[in-house]
Amino acid sequence: NSPGEQEDKCYTLMRGLVEIHNDSFVDDTNESLGNIEWRKVDLYYSNKMGDKLVKKVESVAYSKNTSLERIIVEQLIKGPGDSTMNSTLPSDLKLLSISVSDGICYVNLSSSFLTEMVNVTSEIPVYSIVNSLCSLGNISGVKIMINGDSAKSYRESISLENVLKFNSEVISS
């Protein structure tokens, strides 16, 4: 690669990345920087014991073409980037689709949500997603689907058939 080609690649890469507080990045190569908005959000990760959620406030960047709900779930998949907290979701989990209708957020995840285990109690991964999304204010409940199917249960203990609401009992006090 010539220096000019390297500069072009570097410029293209830098143009597409917006740095977020905790040194994680959102790849947004199709958007001009003028369309980026910032918002503080509550993300719920696991405590070190894996039995409670811990709130982490982060500033996230998102574009008008990428929903804030999508950014939140993608950040949860990336993990906390903080040694005092643990991830709640498998790192290879894919968010297949996400939408909001009448205050309900519909989250469609890949099957690794059910098959890949993280070292936390059963309600932690589910309520990490639910509590983080419900904290936005415009979402009253979350419906989790696996490959489009909602007739599933998580670790045989939490039914995903119903809309789930914010759960304060799983938050560390």
What are these regions (language model features)?
Residues 1-173:
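Bimodal "functional hotspot" detector
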